[in-house]
From Swiss-Prot:
Gene Ontology CC entries for this record: extracellular region
Record-given protein name: Ovomucoid
Disulfide bonding pattern of the chain: C5-C35, C13-C32, C21-C51
Record localization: Secreted
Pfam families: Kazal_1
UniProt keyword terms in alphabetical order: Disulfide bond, Glycoprotein, Protease inhibitor, Repeat, Secreted, Serine protease inhibitor
Residues bearing attached sugar chains per UniProt: N42
Top-level taxonomic group: Eukaryota
InterPro entries named in the record: Bifunctional_prot_inhibitor (IPR051597), Kazal_dom (IPR002350), Kazal_dom_sf (IPR036058), Prot_inh_Kazal-m (IPR001239)
Domain Kazal-like as annotated: residue spans: 3-51
Site (Reactive bond 3): L15, E16
Length: 51
């Protein structure tokens, strides 16, 4: 599974909850917060859902 993070980072994210588990073992609330971390910290996707 891959997440398309083109167009990120964004200055603000919505509050929708669709959790993604990052390679840093942190649960990101949604694609926007995850993709911001990808751009800022070079995180990758471990799996969909909470860590």
């Amino acid at each position: 599974v891959t997440v398309d993070c083109s167009g990120y980072p964004k200055p603000a994210c919505t509050l929708e909850y669709f959790p993604l588990c990052g390679s840093d073992n942190q649960t990101y609330a949604n694609k926007c917060t995850f993709c911001n971390a990808v751009v800022e910290k070079n995180v990758t996707l471990n799996h969909l859902g909470e860590c």
